[in-house]
Each structure stands twice: as C-alpha cells, then as structure tokens.
Amino acid sequence: MLKKDMNIADFDPQLFQAIADETRRQEEHIELIASENYTSPRVLEAQGSQLTNKYAEGYPGKRYYGGCEHVDIAEELAISRAKELFGATYANVQPHSGSQANSAVFMALLQGGDTVLGMSLAHGGHLTHGSHVSFSGKLYNAVQYGIDEATGKIDYAEVERLAVEHKPKMIIAGFSAYSGIIDWGKFREIADKVGAYLFVDMAHVAGLVAAGIYPNPLPHAHVVTTTTHKTLAGPRGGLILSACDDEAIYKKLNSAVFPGGQGGPLMHVIAAKAVAFKEALEPEFTAYQEQVVVNAKAMAKTFIERGYDVVSGGTDNHLFLLDLISKDITGKDADAALGLANITVNKNSVPNDPRSPFVTSGLRIGSPAITRRGFKEEQSVELTNWMCDVLDDITDQGTIERVKNQVLELCARFPVYG
C-alpha cells in the first residue's frame, strides 16, 4: 500500500534540495524570459493529481482503455473552454507541447517534401517554422521570410513575392521574438492567392488574444496552435484550434496527434489546462493581459531613453528585442551579468546578427512573469533602469551587487506565491 505521508524530502534529499533551490530562485530572481510565466496553485493542484495514473489513449467517448469516464469529463471541459476562449469550433488539448502541436499540423496537412513558407528563426520565427535543424526544415522544403530592416516589421511584400515564386502548400504566421502586431488577414489573402493553407502559431500571444488585446487569428487561419503556458499562464503543453468548419481537416488533425505523433495523453496536464482556460475566462485575466502590454511598453521606452536600441523601436505586445550591437556587448555576456544581479533574461539573435546563436548580439525581454507577480509600470521602469545600470558596464561588480540587493528587496515586496 502507498502511504499518503510518503515524501520526497525523506526519500530523495538531493532532488528535494534541487526543487527547493529552484523554488527559492523563482521567488528571489526577476523573470524576464518572454516564454516563461508563473502558473496558479489551482493549476499545480490539478497537475499533481492522481489523474497522472490514468492511461487514456484515444479521445473522449472513444478510448482504447476502460475506466476513462472521469478523465473524459476533464478533457471535455478543457475542449469546451478552449473553444469558448478563442471562438473555435475545433480544439485538440492533447499535444504535449507547442512543437508537437505544430508537428501534428504538418503531418495532417502536408506530405514529406512539400513546400512551406515561414518566418526565419534569425528574424524572430520559431524552430518549427522551417528551421533547417528542425523536422520542419529537414522533412519539408522550407522557404523563409523576414522583417524589413528599416522598420523592424514583417515585410508583407516579401512574403507575397516568395509565396508567388515558390507556391507553398502551407504558409506559417507567428513568432517567438517579434514585437509587432501581425495582420492575419493579409497573410490569409496571400495564402488564398497561391492556394496554400494558412497555419498560425500564436504561442506567444495566446493570452493577449484570449483577452481581446491582440487580433484573433481564428477567423483567418485554417489551423491555429499555441502553447498553454507563456501568456496563457497554464501548464506546459500544446493546443490545436480551428474555426474553418472543415470536418475533414479536424479529422486529419485528430489522427495526426493520436495515433500519428503521440500515444497516451497526459490527463493530469489536460486537467490543468482545463483549470487554466477557466481562469482565462475570468475578468481578472483581461486586466492582467492589459498590464502585461503596459509594462512591456514602459520597459522598451525606458531602454530607448537610456540609449539602447530596441528592434522595431518599441513593442505592441508582451516582448521586445534589445539590440546590443552598438554597445559592443554580446547577448551571452549581458545575460550572464544580469543573472548575477538576479535578473533572468535570455540571449537572442537580432536581425542580421553577426554573432552565432550561442553568443548573439541581443536579449529577448518579456513582461508576463513580472506582471503576474504584481509589477505595474512604476516597478517595470525602475527595473529597466537597474538593468541599464548593469549593462552600462557589465564588469562593474559593485553595480551588480547593488542591483542584486535592490532586486531582492523588490521580490520580497512582490512574492510569486503570497
């Protein structure tokens, strides 16, 4: 018999210490990685439930195992809430990650070797949008578009030119490091012009979309994917959505997830997704997303005022890229210096970056996590000035130590889990 008082601390003190140290790091460090967020205790409760014990291959009402009547309810709740949240007529909540959701879309709509047109990783796209190191670039003929160097915005004329030239079977819109607002309708016009599917990856802005702050791609795209963490602030996982009202596509998508790419779904994670979707339907979630954008704009503006270059000159969403080329600082060194001051960012390539992806010339900065712990515009500006103090001279240990102490004081005032 398994006793309820079993615990990690007694059985595996090494692992327990690692978990405790990470918990402390999250409380004492300021998190600015745009793809990270803090999920709620309710989501953590669902994810740590006994649903983790249940195998449930298949879909609600059509499983390959018995005893699924209760987990069916959990999955049906997640599906119905996802549809309501985004205005979808189809939702698959089983993908284990955003990349696996994207893989399922490729599998459902394409054949190996088909041409796809996606945003270059070097210009803000994602690995799964056609990068040569990803399945999307290895198994398919990937053509890449980028941004206009003068404006920092997507060059729709280039997208259309490449689409007409290469006749892709699928066009991918979406990003991992782009601070503008995408014109989903323009992408659909281009896709229709060449007879392509439009696939939107809204992983980074799904929370903003759910709150009505960022344009919803569902009315324009054949298929939309997202992660369920990031701005949605749920558990780590993936989601596929559609409002194209094409049952044939829906069937292909379901088959591509199971049995095409996955076996048993993670029912404890699906339950956690259901909780997160319910949270996102609450009015408080909209207020949170509005503050996310306010904070990001305030940070970008402050960096510019302090003499730093921001790609595209600002942001319209939750993130922006800091271009450090003019400061002759690598993203790697900037990341390390800020880390010593308890500020967590990630190095990131900037458009036409002369340095390798392992070094880079920029930082990607996002506001979802700091906003989640209660930061407003005042704290965001204060934090940005501290970051500039560190970046002005990354070798100044006195400044780094001073900023670290300021960060610790600020974190104590705004705990993640109060």
Swiss-Prot record:
Sites marked Plays an important role in substrate specificity: 229
GO biological process: glycine biosynthetic process from serine; tetrahydrofolate interconversion
GO MF annotations in UniProt: glycine hydroxymethyltransferase activity; pyridoxal phosphate binding
Enzyme class label: transferase
Main location as per UniProt: cytoplasm
Keywords, comma-separated and alphabetical: Amino-acid biosynthesis, Cytoplasm, One-carbon metabolism, Pyridoxal phosphate, Transferase
Protein name listed in UniProt: Serine hydroxymethyltransferase
